[in-house]
């Protein structure tokens, strides 16, 4: 505990990812609506209106076709997740107080001020406080020290603090906290998984592997679930080759099996979507006499569908059924997507009927698998009809539903969709605005991008480093140097760390602008002198 207290003192001196019932398949009346004329189509507001009255059971944005990894033990991905299902509301002014006391000379002064305040702190509000300060790790850690003093530092709050520290690559402090947790007999298992994941996110694969290797020091014997957890952490952050290398190098201790190969296969299919590598892993499984299972087929079909390979998607689906493997909802979602994408909408509708015959029920992801490719193809009228059908089946739109429309609509409709997201209690989120800003800057619409930037306050979105950097880079790409410099200065004034490469680029653009201005002035002067000389010749 002494180590973490010492670090806390030093910091105090520093002023900074369903269950819904489905009554029946698409009714005949609904099927008719799909073929109705444009004049019968639902508008965005009418289609989304009922969404606000349907409780959404999907509160976080998941990448399209992101498949869960099923292991013989419980799902590994749960160990990397932070529980945000019930964040307690915070008292007004609490975060401002944390900011103010962080400016005091010592941790003792900061703690005294917090203790003297009228704010109450319990386990739930403490967890919410750390979450709200997640982008400013120093403030989050100061708040953690206060909660620790109040006895609010339960298991989940400690795990959250480790996640925050890992996000900011403050691994030494995180390890001090883990040691303190261990010394007071708190479970450090999830903390170790979080450290593996955060190291992988920071591209430090060697330290992720080392974390797995030292689990025994915290009385966690490296076991199959932890091994597969490491592979999952490496793959989910793009280090798929490293994960495969480690899996094969460890085969004496952890014999290769279908579950381990499925983690690697999922990486190539759903993280990178590399068909060539996915096919190689499929062949490699055969070389090790490992028979692909239901999940293996699901990953491959997902991969083929995302690149528009309808033939191989259907081929593997048929092969899967011949082997007696019942396709899950993920497989049908992939097939619905590729059929819709490849302009086989009627066949996709027939497949929806097939779902009922298989004892499965279409969910929000199934409908999103239609909506997204329709939006990508500019078929917004049909997409709106699918949305209306989805809502009529008591299925709630998800963040992915709204994002699909946001990528396809014009600027005026963008604001309307954002409003519907808020009504449906699905955001918008920081990721939503990153998507919109990226689209607008790509379309060379800096004026509209800045209008969206101004709209963030209305939706209670506080600009974070990712939003600042995306906006600054977008403005630079559109030649808006002065506005880019203005927003960069604003970012730094709020205590966010500057980006050296971006700073250099801003300075280079400034120098280029000065040089261009000087050249234009010289050219102007030269032309004026030439004009004067010509007049003097004419007079002679």
UniProtKB/Swiss-Prot annotation:
Per UniProt, the transit peptide runs over 1-87
Q: Where are the PPR repeats?
A: 154-184, 188-222, 223-253, 257-292, 293-327, 328-362, 363-397, 402-428, 429-463, 464-498
- The keyword Transit peptide is assigned to this record: yes
Instruction: Return any one Pfam family short name.
Output: PPR
Chief localization: mitochondrion
- GO CC terms in record: mitochondrion
Q: Which InterPro entries match?
A: Pentatricopeptide_rpt (IPR002885), PPR-containing_protein (IPR050667), PROP1-like_PPR_dom (IPR033443), TPR-like_helical_dom_sf (IPR011990)
Question: Per the database entry, which stretches of residues form a coiled coil?
Answer: none
Which keywords describe this protein according to UniProt? Mitochondrion, Repeat, Transit peptide
Q: Where is this region: Disordered?
A: 514-540
Report the locations given in the UniProt record.
Mitochondrion
The reply to whether Repeat figures as a keyword in the UniProt entry is: yes
The family assignment reads: Belongs to the PPR family. P subfamily.
- What is the recorded name of this protein? Pentatricopeptide repeat-containing protein At1g80880, mitochondrial
Give the species.
Answer: Arabidopsis thaliana
């Amino acid at each position: 505990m002494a180590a973490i207290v010492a670090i806390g003192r030093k910091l105090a001196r520093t002023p900074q990812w369903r269950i819904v019932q489905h009554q029946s398949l698409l009714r005949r009346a609904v099927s008719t609506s799909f073929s109705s004329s444009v004049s019968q189509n639902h508008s965005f507001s009418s289609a989304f209106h009922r969404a606000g009255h349907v409780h959404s059971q999907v509160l976080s944005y998941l990448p399209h076709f992101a498949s869960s990894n099923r292991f013989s033990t419980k799902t590994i991905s749960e160990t990397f997740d932070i529980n945000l299902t019930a964040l307690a509301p915070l008292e007004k002014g609490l975060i401002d107080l944390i900011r103010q006391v962080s400016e005091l000379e010592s941790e003792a002064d900061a703690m005294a001020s917090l203790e003297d305040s009228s704010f109450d702190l319990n386990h739930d509000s403490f967890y919410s406080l750390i979450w709200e300060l997640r982008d400013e790790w120093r403030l989050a850690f100061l708040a953690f020290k206060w909660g620790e003093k109040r006895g609010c530092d339960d298991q989940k709050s400690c795990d959250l603090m480790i996640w925050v520290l890992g996000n900011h690559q403050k691994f030494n402090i995180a390890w001090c906290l883990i040691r303190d947790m261990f010394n007071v007999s708190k479970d450090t298992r999830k903390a170790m998984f979080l450290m593996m994941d955060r190291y992988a996110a920071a591209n430090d694969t060697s330290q992720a592997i080392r974390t797995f290797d030292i689990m025994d020091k915290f009385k966690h014997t490296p076991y199959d679930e932890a091994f597969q957890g490491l592979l999952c952490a490496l793959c989910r952050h793009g280090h798929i080759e490293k994960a495969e290398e480690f899996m094969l190098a460890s085969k004496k201790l952890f014999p290769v099996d279908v579950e381990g190969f499925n983690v690697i296969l999922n990486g190539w299919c759903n993280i990178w979507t590399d068909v060539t590598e996915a096919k190689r892993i499929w062949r490699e499984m055969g070389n090790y006499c490992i028979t692909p299972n239901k999940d293996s087929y699901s990953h491959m079909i997902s991969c083929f569908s995302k690149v528009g390979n309808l033939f191989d998607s259907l081929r593997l689906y048929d092969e899967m059924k011949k082997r007696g493997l019942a396709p899950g909802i993920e497989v049908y979602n992939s097939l619905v997507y590729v059929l819709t994408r490849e302009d086989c909408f009627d066949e996709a509708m027939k497949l929806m009927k097939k779902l009922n015959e298989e004892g499965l029920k279409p969910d929000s992801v199934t409908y999103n698998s239609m909506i997204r490719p329709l939006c990508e193809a500019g078929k917004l009228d049909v997409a709106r009809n699918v949305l209306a059908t989805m809502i009529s089946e008591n299925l709630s739109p998800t963040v992915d539903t709204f994002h699909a429309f946001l990528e396809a609509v014009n600027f005026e409709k963008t604001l309307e969709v954002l409003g519907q997201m808020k009504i449906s209690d699905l955001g918008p989120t920081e990721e939503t605005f990153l998507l919109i800003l990226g689209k607008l800057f790509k379309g060379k619409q800096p004026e509209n991008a800045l209008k969206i930037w101004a709209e963030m306050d209305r939706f209670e979105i506080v600009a974070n480093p990712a939003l600042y950097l995306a906006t600054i880079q977008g403005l630079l790409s559109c030649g808006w140097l002065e506005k880019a410099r203005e927003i960069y200065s604003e970012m730094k004034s709020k205590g966010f760390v500057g980006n050296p490469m971006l700073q250099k680029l801003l300075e280079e653009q400034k120098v280029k602008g000065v040089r261009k201005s000087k050249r234009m002035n010289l050219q102007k002067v030269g032309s004026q002198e030439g004009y004067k000389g010509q007049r003097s010749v004419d007079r002679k």
